[in-house]
């Protein structure tokens, strides 16, 4: 939690004034029982109406000043807590945007979503309550004990015993629950992950009648969450009844002791009432303090989870080797890659070159490493061994910004953002003019439907839900083309296009004036047969590299893929 306090640095004044005004309010509260004692012992005993009225007005004044102090404290506490949470949320969001693909895979989007929403809210609530109660409640408990000593030391000893017992209960429950709250948050991540997975795959689940299976899976996750919450709740639920029992026993003993002291003339009735009020104040404040500790316990658990994300190592490793070794657009030299330490290589000993302006096809079975291979070029992931060069230079010697200006990628899942088409295309080149954007739209074979929907000002809903799959893919390609990249990667990003549109797209890519090197990842040999070079992957190994005709002759994996799509040798002969 201490590491997160840096986000309070802009709210030092509010963090000082909030507890200060709460202490002012508490001071007036501690004086009230003494005034009431005076009303009983002086005003009522002597029948002095003027004294009673003056002291009642004094109580009203204390109440008004206390209320103003409380409102002011609440304002400063809320301002500091909201500002703290806003800064923390900004840093967390920025950190998430800096995470590499491998870290995103490892942590999980559902977990990150929980951290930036629920966990930040928990910490915000904790900060708010701490600023308002952390000093006020102990101050009143301590002050009430001191006041009790000034009235009667014997009664004050009873106060100290009750406070000591309550402290054991409160801190004992806190220690028992703090780890449980962290477990609850982790299980909540699992529930959210299951929910997210089901929502994203709803159509597939229903297509295969998997609702019952997925429901059972969710019930299992949710039941575990419920079990953790109930076990923690049972412990937390002991807090209020145990504190009430201890306080009420203390009050009972106090009243009995006070009655004896009044009968012997040691204490007055007003003093006993004052002692009772101080005991009641201790009760109220200890309950507040107990609830504060529960909230702070949750906040500490959430703060630890937030800190784990903020401390993730996102430092990209760069190479000092900026030497240009050759004129190849892309070169892989004995490249291997695995996603996790100790895991099997997703790619193993890959070597090939791509020349400027070439169209390179990448094909292979499911899980063969196609997406992994092209993802290494813009450094979505880093190679475990070997060297990758872009324009003859080690890819690790480029800054990510410089590299990704050269390399534009269209991913398997076409992602568009809410706004206009123009706003989406500017992601590819923030300085692009309308003419350049229209040229990119035309090259992506999207001009017809874009024109019919309002041109560059056409509205796009979140994730492009108002467009078909093929339309989203074409606009994603247009966005990549706007930047005039030196290297364009199409990762199975034309799968939703019909053959006619796909053929027109291939022709447009070949005719681009800047002649980029194009990598086309596809499952369809028809999409790659005109490529200058085709890379054939099988279980992470490069088993073939050449033209379509050459691979049909000498690569059994490619031949098998081709035959499965076109019916064997007869189709090949044609």
Question: In which residue ranges do the predicted regions lie?
Answer:
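An intracellular "coupling" helix at the cytosolic face of ABC transporter transmembrane type-1 domains
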Residues: 9-13, 101-102, 118-131, 135, ...
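Transmembrane helices of ABC transporter permease
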Residues: 10, 14-27, 59-62, 68, ...
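Hydrophobic alpha-helical segments in the permease module
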Residues: 59-70, 163-167, 236-250, 256, ...
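ABC-type nucleotide-binding domain
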Residues: 324-574
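Short intracellular "coupling" helices and adjacent cytoplasmic loop segments at the cytosolic face
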Residues: 46-47, 82, 90-114, 118-120, ...
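Juxtamembrane helix-loop junctions of ABC transporter transmembrane domains
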Residues: 20-21, 25-37, 41, 53, ...
């Amino acid at each position: 939690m201490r590491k997160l306090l840096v986000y309070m640095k802009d709210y030092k004044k509010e963090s000082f004034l909030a507890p200060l005004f709460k202490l002012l309010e508490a001071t007036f509260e501690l004086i009230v029982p003494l005034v009431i004692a005076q009303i009983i012992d002086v005003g009522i005993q002597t029948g002095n109406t003027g004294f009673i009225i003056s002291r009642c007005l004094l109580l009203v004044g204390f109440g008004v000043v206390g209320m103003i102090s409380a409102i002011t404290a609440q304002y400063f506490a809320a301002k500091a807590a909201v500002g703290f949470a806003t800064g923390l949320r900004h840093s967390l969001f920025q950190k998430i945007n800096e995470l590499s693909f491998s870290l995103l895979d490892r942590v999980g989007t559902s977990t990150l979503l929980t951290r930036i929403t629920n966990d930040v809210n928990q910490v915000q609530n904790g900060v708010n309550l701490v600023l308002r109660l952390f000093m006020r409640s102990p101050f009143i408990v301590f002050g009430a004990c001191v006041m009790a000593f000034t009235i009667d030391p014997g009664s004050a000893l009873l106060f100290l015993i009750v406070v000591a017992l309550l402290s054991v209960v409160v801190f004992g429950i806190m220690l028992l629950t703090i780890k449980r709250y962290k477990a609850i948050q982790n299980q909540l991540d699992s529930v959210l992950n299951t929910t997210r997975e089901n929502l994203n795959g709803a159509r597939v689940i229903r297509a295969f009648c998997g609702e019952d299976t997925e429901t059972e899976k969710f019930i299992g996750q949710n039941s575990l969450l419920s079990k953790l919450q109930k076990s923690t709740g049972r412990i937390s639920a002991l807090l209020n009844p145990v504190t009430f029992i201890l306080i009420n026993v203390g009050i009972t003993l106090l009243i009995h002791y006070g009655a004896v002291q009044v009968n012997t003339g040691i204490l007055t009735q007003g003093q006993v009432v004052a002692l009772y009020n101080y005991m009641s104040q201790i009760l109220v404040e200890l309950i507040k303090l107990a609830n504060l500790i529960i909230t702070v316990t949750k906040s500490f658990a959430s703060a630890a989870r937030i800190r784990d994300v903020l401390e993730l190592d996102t430092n990209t490793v760069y190479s000092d080797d900026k030497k240009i070794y050759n004129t190849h657009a892309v070169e892989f030299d004995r490249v291997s890659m695995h996603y996790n330490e100790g895991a099997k290589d997703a790619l193993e000993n890959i070597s090939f070159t791509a020349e400027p302006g070439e169209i390179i096809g990448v094909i292979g079975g499911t899980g063969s490493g196609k997406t992994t291979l092209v993802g290494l070029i813009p450094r979505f992931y880093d190679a475990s061994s070997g060297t990758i060069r872009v324009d003859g230079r080690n890819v690790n010697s480029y800054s990510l910004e410089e590299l990704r200006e050269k390399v534009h990628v269209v991913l398997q899942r076409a992602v568009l953002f809410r706004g206009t088409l123009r706003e989406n295309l500017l992601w590819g080149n923030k300085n692009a003019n309308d003419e350049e954007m229209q040229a990119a739209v035309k090259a992506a074979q999207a001009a017809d439907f874009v024109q019919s929907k309002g041109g560059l000002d056409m509205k796009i809903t979140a994730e492009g839900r108002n467009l078909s799959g093929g339309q989203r893919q074409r606009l994603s390609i247009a966005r990549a083309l706007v930047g005039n990249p030196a290297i364009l990667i199409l990762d199975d990003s034309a799968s939703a296009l019909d053959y006619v549109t796909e053929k027109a797209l291939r022709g447009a890519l070949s005719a681009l004036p800047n002649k980029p090197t194009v990598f086309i990842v596809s499952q369809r040999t028809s999409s790659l047969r005109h490529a200058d070079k085709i890379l054939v992957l099988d279980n992470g190994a490069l088993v073939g590299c050449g033209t379509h005709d050459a691979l049909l002759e000498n690569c059994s994996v490619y031949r098998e893929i081709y035959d499965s799509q076109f019916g064997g040798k007869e189709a090949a002969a044609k």
